[in-house]
């Protein structure tokens, strides 16, 4: 018995791995040997962009617009803090994948009992469906704003992006990364142009990045601040990142893993900085266009669109805003498909054809969106968008806590285990997020 226990400790995992994560693209992107730093960095760049997509989805837009229109530039510091937390958690996710060769779903399935693993899978699937609902809503609103397509038809049209995803997966993983990066740049350029048109107060922006005591003392401001924090770190991103870092052909040796961890950190930090700039730009735009003109109650994305042209005095302001929204929705679609595949294969060891997997997720997202749109129209759509963010908040801790557990476990991580200082910080962040999301859930239920 003692010998068996010792052997299991050495192995650190209960079962041998059945298949690598995302086996069709695992170890598929070449890394040039003996290349210079920037050439290698370019080869590693890409996964971070796919992760950053989750930080600029329509759910984030709603909280940033509300924060900027109601409280000006004050909540910029909250966006900055959220981004720092995101960098920490995403670095842990990528390290788990690189060191162990398992994604977060595979690691959770091995570590926990079957019943609890099944519960984690259900929660992860709910989070992915909630994310997909936000993508569907964002794309449908953008199609309505740009082309006048009724919301209910816009929701149905979003089903067609399944074929885009399948085509890109067939062409190769690098193609997906290029498309995502292109759309991210589109969003950044759009909001950069909007910011120039809005003539923001640069001194107020600089002050906004310094945390203010009123964020805690003002209940209304605190709620929106918590909403920004709660909607920033997406649970499906942790599963996704731990998998897609393994698409690179780095040497599966001690030195190879060290190098991969270093380049992956640079990649994700750079991409999340772009996401920070986008989210900050949305809040700055809302503050400059609405808060300073006395329009403090901009309720949703459509309201912001309608108010931009008369407020900024430019006929293209609203169009640029809608193009960025469409790019955001389509971008998130690409990553949602991959995340769904990862959690199903990792937790259940069930491998579905990509078309079946994508159809399943999209149908489960479209059905509630169609029903709510048909019954309640645009107001119902905005309520559904908010509800999807609550679902994500509820699930987040069930991804963060296992991630911190595994990366702090020397048996699983070996010499790559989190050092003591990082363990303390990681657990503090995990507990903080858990308390935050419990508060958000309680507040949402009591205000229904």
Curated annotation (Swiss-Prot):
Keywords for this protein: Cell membrane, Ion transport, Membrane, Symport, Transmembrane, Transmembrane helix, Transport
Top-level division of the source organism's lineage: Bacteria
TM region positions: 41-61, 69-89, 117-137, 147-167, 176-196, 215-235, 270-290, 307-327, 363-383, 384-404, 424-444
Main subcellular localisation: membrane
Keyword Hydrolase: no
Assigned GO CC terms: plasma membrane
UniProt keyword Acyltransferase present: no
UniProt xrefs under InterPro entries: NRAMP_fam (IPR001046)
Molecular function GO terms recorded: cadmium ion transmembrane transporter activity; manganese ion transmembrane transporter activity; metal ion binding; symporter activity
Any one of the GO BP annotations: iron ion transmembrane transport
Pfam hit, one: Nramp
Membrane topology (UniProt): Multi-pass membrane protein
Cellular localisation: Cell membrane
UniProt record similarity statement: Belongs to the NRAMP family.
NCBIfam families per record: nramp (TIGR01197), Nramp_1 (NF037982), PRK00701.1 (NF001923)
Function: H(+)-stimulated, divalent metal cation uptake system.
Protein known as: Divalent metal cation transporter MntH
Organism of derivation: Listeria welshimeri serovar 6b (strain ATCC 35897 / DSM 20650 / CCUG 15529 / CIP 8149 / NCTC 11857 / SLCC 5334 / V8)
Species classification: Bacteria, Bacillati, Bacillota, Bacilli, Bacillales
């Amino acid at each position: 018995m003692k010998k068996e226990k010792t052997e299991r400790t050495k192995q650190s995992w209960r079962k041998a791995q059945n298949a690598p994560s995302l086996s069709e693209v695992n170890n598929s992107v070449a890394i040039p040997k003996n290349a210079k730093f920037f050439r290698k960095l370019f080869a590693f760049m890409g996964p971070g962009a796919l992760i950053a997509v989750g930080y600029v989805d329509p759910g984030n837009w709603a909280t940033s617009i509300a924060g900027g229109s109601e409280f000006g530039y004050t909540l910029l510091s909250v966006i900055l803090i959220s981004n720092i937390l995101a960098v920490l958690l995403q670095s842990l996710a990528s390290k788990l994948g690189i060191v162990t060769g398992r994604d977060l779903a595979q690691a959770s399935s091995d570590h926990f009992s079957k019943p609890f693993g099944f519960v984690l899978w259900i929660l992860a699937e709910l989070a992915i469906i909630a994310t997909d609902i936000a993508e569907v809503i964002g794309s449908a609103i953008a199609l309505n704003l740009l082309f006048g397509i009724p919301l209910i038809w816009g929701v149905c049209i979003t089903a067609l992006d399944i074929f885009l995803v399948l085509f890109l997966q067939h062409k190769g993983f690098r193609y997906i990364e290029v498309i995502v990066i292109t759309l991210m740049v589109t969003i950044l350029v759009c909001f950069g142009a909007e910011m120039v048109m809005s003539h923001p107060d640069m001194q107020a922006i600089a002050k906004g990045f310094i945390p203010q005591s009123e964020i805690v003392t003002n209940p209304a401001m605190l709620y929106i601040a918590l909403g920004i924090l709660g909607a920033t770190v997406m649970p499906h991103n942790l599963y996704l990142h731990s998998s897609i870092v393994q698409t690179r052909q780095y040497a599966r040796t001690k030195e190879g893993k060290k190098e991969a961890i270093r380049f992956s950190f640079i990649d994700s930090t750079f991409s999340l900085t772009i996401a920070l700039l986008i989210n900050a730009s949305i809040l700055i735009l809302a503050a400059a266009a609405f808060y300073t003109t006395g329009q403090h109650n901009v309720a949703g994305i459509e309201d912001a669109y309608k108010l931009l042209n008369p407020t900024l005095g430019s006929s293209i302001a609203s169009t640029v805003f809608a193009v960025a929204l469409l790019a955001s929705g389509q971008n998130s679609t690409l990553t949602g498909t991959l995340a769904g595949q990862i959690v199903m294969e990792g937790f259940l060891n069930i491998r579905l054809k990509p078309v079946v997997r994508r159809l399943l997720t999209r149908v489960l997202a479209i059905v509630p969106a169609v029903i709510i749109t048909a019954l309640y129209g645009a107001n119902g759509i905005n309520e559904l968008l908010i509800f999807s963010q609550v679902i994500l908040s509820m699930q987040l801790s069930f991804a963060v806590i296992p991630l911190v557990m595994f990366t702090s476990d020397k048996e699983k991580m070996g010499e790559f285990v989190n050092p003591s200082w990082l363990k303390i910080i990681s657990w503090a962040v995990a507990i903080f997020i858990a308390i935050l999301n419990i508060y958000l859930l309680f507040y949402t239920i009591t205000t229904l």
